[in-house]
A protein has these predicted regions:
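Small-residue-enriched core segments of transmembrane alpha-helices in multipass membrane transport
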Residues: 38-59, 70-77, 138-153
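Structural signature of multi-pass, alpha-helical inner-membrane proteins
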Residues: 1-18, 168-172, 178
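Interfacial segments of transmembrane alpha-helices in multi-pass membrane proteins
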Residues: 8-63, 129-133
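Membrane-embedded alpha-helices of multi-pass transport/permease systems
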Residues: 78-81, 85-88, 158
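Hydrophobic alpha-helical bundle architecture
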Residues: 29-33, 54-65, 70, 74, ...
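Residue-level signature of catalytic and energy-coupling elements of molecular machines
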Residues: 6, 25, 54, 82, ...
Length: 178
């Protein structure tokens, strides 16, 4: 639902800016990371779907701070994909096989993803505990978004990568850009 404090124009601008940001992410990721970029965008879409479904299940009211938290969540979620993709690229450059590069890339990126998300979650929890009104709403959406982002980055993207580049397939090259 939409809170009474949000005017029609604010809703429209917030949604439009999020959509344009999402389109920019799609283009950049697909061009820069090729197949892995498309996988990242699919993962981001699933993350957004999880977050919206969770907010809907909780019957949360959409406010401007909540919309800002969703936009921030999208940025953090795609950052996790970039970390994973870059780790995989590093492992390919180190001479590992494509399958080994994927496996090592996910393992090596996990610590960084966890650290960055936990520190942001601590800030979100502090905002929730000590904030009021719109600040609490922002904090709730942020924390839920962090949880869905971490789940999506590790489990959803890995499942898609495994589907595309399954362990039993003989792969000589990954489509992840240079």
């Amino acid at each position: 639902t939409v809170g009474p404090s949000m005017g029609k124009e604010n809703i429209s601008r917030g949604v439009q800016s999020t959509i344009w940001g999402f389109i920019a992410i799609i283009i950049m990721m697909a061009l820069y990371y090729m197949v892995f970029g498309v996988i990242s965008v699919i993962t981001l879409s699933v993350n957004l779907l999880f977050l919206v479904a969770l907010l809907s299940a909780l019957q949360a009211t959409l406010t401007l701070p909540g919309l800002a938290a969703i936009a921030l969540t999208l940025g953090m979620a795609i950052d996790s994909s970039v970390l994973i993709n870059e780790r995989i690229r590093d492992e390919i450059r180190n001479g590992n096989t494509p399958q080994a590069s994927i496996s090592i890339g996910y393992k090596m990126a996990w610590g960084t993803i966890l650290d960055s998300n936990i520190t942001t979650m601590i800030a979100g929890l502090a905002l929730f505990m000590f904030g009021s009104g719109p600040i609490k709403g922002f904090a709730v959406v942020l924390v839920l978004g962090i949880l869905t982002s971490m789940f999506s980055a590790i489990f959803v993207s890995r499942a898609i990568v495994n589907y595309v580049y399954g362990n039993k397939r003989q792969i000589s090259k990954l489509s992840i850009g240079e």
